[in-house]
A protein has these predicted regions:
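Flexible, glycine-/basic-rich loop-and-beta segments that form/coincide
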Residues: 2-3, 297-381
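Long recognition/docking surfaces used for binding and targeting
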Residues: 31-110
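Conserved S-adenosyl-L-methionine
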Residues: 112-206, 211-212, 263-265, 275-276, ...
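DNA target-recognition patches
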Residues: 215-223, 403-438
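Conserved Class I SAM-dependent methyltransferase catalytic core
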Residues: 234-300, 305-307
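A short glycine-rich beta-alpha junction/loop motif
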Residues: 306, 370, 472-480, 512-539, ...
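Non-catalytic DNA-recognition/assembly elements of restriction-modification systems
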Residues: 347-409, 423-424, 531-573
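A short beta-sheet element
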Residues: 441-444, 448-499
Length: 573
């Protein structure tokens, strides 16, 4: 039987009461997790609607009346607590159980289970953007527990809905929910990269996993090989977001439209520039919406909603980061907020801009709205950068032939730092050594914890020097060597800011010159930077340094692995 959402009269208190009672019944006997709660409520629904009053009879009834896979799922998850379902069936109505399964609360369980779903407000926004018409085929790749399909299938009698989910338990929960609330829905267990290539849809949604790289993606080899032949811009370090987006495009009809939720960084980092160029050059990006932070229960990561379709000559960029209702633990996009965002897709406003190919090309094909919407760069607790600086010098202006004469073939206590020695915000350990220097060059030495910022060229490089005692490093002339007042500001906090999208956009505003972009010292000193309390600065700086240390360890492991590869041939006798 198909149940209508509008007939359930959902009350959050009742849903909460069901969860509370389940926790009370099984406290000390089992770990209370959303899957267990859902299955117990599902079994209570079966018991109540079929007048089953015994635990063994309930398990037997389920075994005889549902699919073998579902029966196994129910027994695997809830066999030891099945009597709780009978207790619930005597306390609540079937409408209460249906409301619970429709809402399926997961927030009480933390990160792991919250990852299985999409916030309702995001599903609603995606639904409004997709504007599903009668008879259209709709897919959700990585459908989790079926949040999107359950929501958008309401009153869609003549549409076909398809879900694909690799986690068997999530898939079965999704199937239960679609059986109850969605007509013409089919949820398939499996890898989305293994979906038949000829399976096409007019509308597609995907809230795929965050923070993955191609090298970590356990996707079908055949698909990736085929994809790389078609899109050589894809590299091993490419963000998985763009691999997922490529898959979505492959399953979209010629006139179709898709919405995906992706990470902020993939819209602007240098690693993904070539694949962004491919998508933009081929007219595959219709719009990009920067979403409010803290929408998800399991992460505070900044996210982007991307609209994919074909034959686009420009891209609509919207900054909706402040268009939300702020909650204590989680932000929500209200129905009113959704309508405002929909209007911004079509109408002018301070938070929206349409950008053509040439402008995108001039901006490294960055797709983050803050790059193009100057008014959106807001700095909280802002001060002029110059007020935090003790001194600024430029590195030594050395000619190539002068430098060649100064290079030492043997280690000395003086080394030379060039721009090429700064990669991904870190200074190389293998800097060239210099012979005895003219004392006049001493003023160009870099101090410990000095902030380094490239003056010319793009993208700009930022680093914090960590110099051991007894070691001297001469800076290149294309560097600002900045000694900060560390009683006011943590250098690693400023580095983290400059490397953020907001910080990058702030730096970009003071850049002059198009052929060779450069930053003037005067403009740099007037630049507004955030200055929160030192406690918060240190917290951000510590997180940044910890992640930087993690990268160094990974780089060392990678170097060792490469060295090991060179010796494999000789190991086999």
């Amino acid at each position: 039987m198909l149940y209508r959402k509008e007939n359930l009269n959902i009350e959050s208190k009742v849903v909460g009461d069901i969860t509370y009672n389940i926790i009370s019944f099984i406290r000390g006997r089992s770990v209370v997790e959303p899957q267990l709660c859902f299955v117990l409520v599902y079994a209570a629904h079966i018991a109540l609607t079929n007048n089953v009053n015994d635990a063994d009879d309930l398990l037997s009834f389920i075994e005889e009346n549902v699919s073998e896979q579902r029966a196994m799922f129910v027994k695997e998850v809830a066999r030891d607590c099945i009597e709780v379902s009978l207790q619930l069936s005597k306390m609540f109505s079937d409408k209460d159980f249906l409301a619970y399964m429709l809402v399926f609360p997961r927030g009480f369980a933390g990160k792991l289970y919250a990852e299985s779903g999409t916030p309702e407000s995001l599903s609603k926004l995606a639904n409004r953007i997709l504007d599903i018409k009668e008879n259209e085929r709709v897919a959700d790749f990585g459908s989790g527990v079926g949040d999107f399909i359950t929501l958008v299938s309401e009153n869609k009698e003549n549409n076909y809905f398809y879900g694909n989910e690799i986690n068997s338990r999530y898939c079965e929960i999704s199937r239960i929910r679609t059986d109850l609330f969605a007509k013409n829905a089919h949820v398939e267990l499996g890898d989305m990269f293994a979906v038949a290539g000829d399976k096409k849809f007019e509308k597609i949604f995907s809230n795929y996993p965050f923070g993955m790289r191609l090298i970590n993606l356990n996707a079908q080899t055949d698909y990736l090989e085929s994809l790389h032949k078609r899109i050589p811009e894809i590299k091993r370090a490419t963000s998985a977001d763009w691999i997922f987006n490529s898959l979505i495009i492959d399953h979209l009809t010629e006139d179709g439209k898709a919405v995906a939720i992706m990470t902020n960084g993939s819209t602007w980092n240098s690693i993904d520039q070539k694949i962004r160029e491919y998508f933009i050059r081929n007219g595959l990006v219709e719009a990009v919406i920067a979403l409010p932070s803290n929408l998800f229960e399991y992460t505070h990561i900044s996210t982007i909603l991307i609209v994919l379709s074909r034959n686009n000559e420009s891209v609509r960029l919207i900054d909706s980061t402040s268009i939300c209702e702020q909650g204590r633990r989680q932000n929500i996009i209200t129905d009113e907020n959704i309508e405002r965002i929909i209007r911004l897709l079509k109408e002018e406003g301070e938070e929206a801009v349409t950008v053509d190919f040439k402008t995108l090309q001039q901006n490294e094909f960055v797709l983050n709205p803050s790059r193009y919407l100057e008014n959106t760069v807001e700095i909280q607790d802002g001060v002029e950068f110059g007020s935090l600086i003790k001194s600024v010098t430029r590195g030594a202006q050395l000619k190539a032939n002068e430098l060649d004469e100064m290079i030492s073939d043997t280690p000395t206590d003086v080394q030379y730092l060039m721009l090429s020695n700064i990669q991904n915000g870190m200074i190389s350990e293998d800097l060239p050594y210099l012979k005895e220097l003219n004392p006049k060059l001493g003023k160009y030495f870099i101090g410990n914890r000095n902030l380094l910022l490239s003056k010319n060229g793009a993208p700009f490089k930022v680093a914090v020097a960590e110099i051991e005692e007894g070691r001297k490093i001469l800076g290149n002339g294309n560097l600002f060597i900045i000694a900060l007042d560390e009683e006011k500001v943590n250098p690693f906090f400023i580095k983290a800011f400059f490397e953020s999208e907001v910080g990058f956009a702030s730096l970009k505003k003071i850049v002059v010159g198009s052929t060779i972009p450069n930053i003037s010292l005067e403009s740099l000193k007037k630049l507004i930077v955030p200055l929160p309390p030192m406690e918060k600065q240190n917290e951000i700086a510590d997180l940044y340094q910890a992640k930087q240390d993690e990268i160094k360890v990974l780089q060392l492991k990678l170097e060792k692995a490469h060295n090991a590869l060179r010796g494999i041939f000789g190991e086999v006798k």
